[in-house]
Swiss-Prot record:
Family membership noted in the UniProt record: Belongs to the AdoMet synthase family.
Native organism: Synechococcus sp. (strain ATCC 27144 / PCC 6301 / SAUG 1402/1) (Anacystis nidulans)
Reaction(s) catalysed by this chain's protein: L-methionine + ATP + H2O = S-adenosyl-L-methionine + phosphate + diphosphate
Protein name in the entry: S-adenosylmethionine synthase
Pfam family, one: S-AdoMet_synt_M
Length: 406
C-alpha cells in the first residue's frame, strides 16, 4: 500500500503530529486520529503536551509530501480544509499511566514499575526465516513493490502515476515453504491519458508493461524466488483507476493494521499504531513482541516464532507472556519463554527506555514515527529501527544450547 492511499495519508499525518509533539515535549501523551475525504482533513483525538505546534501546517506539508499538490484530484495540500477537534487525555487514564498500580499500592519500588500501561489489550509479534529481514514473504514482497511504485512516481520515471496504490502478492507453499509466485497484483492510480494514448485499454496495456519492467523486475532482481510463466500479473483489474485518494475513498487512521504488521500471516490483537505515543502498549508492546520474536529466529532457535503479550491499564507488569514456535523450535517453547523473561524488558517503561521511543523523534530531526506509517512497521531494512535489532540473538543461542546440554 502506497503513501497516497487515503488510510495511509491519515496514518502519516497522525504520526507526523506525534513526531512534532515528542520532539518538543518527549513526555507528550498523544492519541491523534485523522479523517480525510474530498477536500477535507479532520484532526481529532486526545493530546496532553507542553509543545506548541501548528498542526494545520504539519498536515499540509505531509499531504504535499505524499504527492497531493494539484487541484485536479479533489484533494490538495493547499486547497483542502483542515479542521482540528482535540481534547486532553482523560485524567482517569493519566493517573494510571503516571503511577502504576504496583507503586500506588506500594507493592513494588522497582524503577520500571513506575509507569502503567496506557490501555488493556493483547499484542503479537512475529518473525520467520522466509525473507532476509525475517518477515513473511508475501508482505515483504508487497511492501517492496509498493515502495518501488512510489520510487518511479517520485523520480518521474513513470510520471503518469498518481499517489494512491495497493500491492498484493500470493505465494504458493509446499510443506510450509514458499516455492512459487502465484499472483502479483498492483492497483495504481494514474492519469486518464499517457502522452497521446487515451483509449482506456491501451492505457492499461502501457501501465502493465511499464510496471513489469520498472517495478516488478527490479524488486525480484536479487531474490531466489522469481515470477515465472505461470505467475498471474494483474494490474488495475477494474480497467481504470483515475479517481483515487481521498476523492475516491474516505480515509481513517488505524484502518490498515494488517498491512502495518505481517500481512495476516500471524495473529493480531486489534490495536493500531499510528498517532499513539509509546505509553500506549498497542504500539510499544507490539514493537517489543517483534523484537523478541526476531531475536529468537535470528538465533536459529526457531524457523517461525510468535510472541504474545497482554496488559491491564494502569498496571506495569504484563498480564501474560507467551511464545509459540509452531513446531519449528530447536528447544521447547517453555525454555524460550524462560529466556524471554530473563533477557527482555517488557514493562512499558522499560520498553520505552530500551528503544528510546520518546526521544528518537527529536534525535532524528523530527522524523521517526512518520517513516513507518507507510510501507510497514517491521522488516524495514531501509530504516534504523531499534525493534529490528538482533543484538540478543547470540546470548539466546548460547543459553539455549547450555540448557539442552544440561
Amino acid at each position: 500500500m502506497t503513501e497516497g492511499h487515503p488510510d495511509k495519508i491519515c496514518d502519516q499525518i497522525s504520526d507526523t503530529i506525534l513526531d512534532a509533539l515528542l520532539t518538543e515535549d518527549p513526555s507528550s501523551r498523544v492519541a491523534a486520529e485523522v479523517v480525510v475525504n474530498t477536500g477535507l482533513v479532520l484532526i481529532t483525538g486526545e493530546v496532553s503536551t507542553q509543545a506548541q505546534t501548528n498542526l494545520i501546517d504539519l498536515a499540509r506539508r505531509k499531504i504535499a509530501e505524499t504527492g497531493y499538490t494539484g487541484e485536479d484530484s479533489g484533494f490538495g495540500a493547499n486547497n483542502c480544509t483542515v479542521l482540528i477537534a482535540l481534547d486532553k487525555q482523560s485524567p482517569d487514564i493519566a493517573q494510571g499511566v503516571d503511577t502504576a498500580q504496583e507503586q500506588r499500592q506500594a507493592s513494588s519500588d522497582e524503577r520500571f514499575d513506575s509507569i502503567g500501561a496506557g490501555d488493556q489489550g493483547i499484542m503479537f509479534g512475529y518473525a520467520c526465516n522466509e525473507a532476509p529481514e525475517l518477515m513473511p514473504l508475501p508482505i515483504s514482497l508487497s511492501h517492496r513493490l509498493a515502495r518501488q511504485l512510489a520510487v518511479v512516481r517520485h523520480n518521474g520515471q513513470l510520471d503518469y502515476l498518481r499517489p494512491d496504490g495497493k500491492t498484493q502478492v500470493t505465494i504458493a507453499y509446499e510443506d510450509g515453504k514458499p516455492v512459487a509466485i502465484d499472483t502479483i497484483l498492483i492497483s495504481t492510480q494514474h492519469k486518464a491519458a499517457i502522452g497521446d494514448i487515451s483509449d482506456d485499454n491501451a492505457v492499461q496495456e502501457r501501465i502493465k508493461s511499464d510496471l513489469w519492467e520498472q517495478v516488478v523486475l527490479p524488486v525480484f532482481s536479487d531474490l531466489v524466488i522469481q515470477p515465472d510463466s505461470a505467475t498471474r500479473f494483474l494490474v488495475n483489474p477494474t480497467g481504470k483507476f483515475v479517481i483515487g485518494g481521498p476523492q475516491g475513498d474516505a480515509g481513517l487512521t488505524g484502518r490498515k493494521i494488517i498491512v502495518d504488521t505481517y500481512g495476516g500471516y500471524s495473529r493480531h490483537g486489534g490495536g493500531a499504531f499510528s498517532g499513539k505515543d509509546p505509553t500506549k502498549v498497542d504500539r510499544s508492546a507490539a514493537y517489543a513482541c517483534r523484537y523478541v520474536a526476531k531475536n529468537i529466529v535470528a538465533a536459529g532457535l526457531a524457523e517461525k516464532c510468535e510472541v504474545q503479550l497482554s496488559y491491564a491499564i494502569g498496571v506495569a507488569r504484563p498480564v501474560s507472556v507467551l511464545v509459540e514456535t509452531f513446531g519449528t523450535g530447536k528447544v521447547a517453547d517453555e525454555v524460550l519463554l524462560d529466556l524471554v523473561r530473563k533477557h527482555f524488558e517488557l514493562h512499558p517503561a522499560g520498553i520505552i527506555e530500551h528503544f528510546n521511543l520518546q526521544r528518537l523523534p527529536g534525535e532524528r530531526g523530527g522524523r521517526f514515527y512518520q517513516e513507518v506509517a507507510a510501507y510497514g512497521h517491521f522488516g524495514r531494512n531501509d530504516l534504523d529501527l531499534p525493534w529490528e535489532q538482533t543484538d540478543k540473538a547470540d546470548t539466546l543461542r548460547q543459553e539455549a544450547l547450555a540448557t539442552t546440554q544440561a
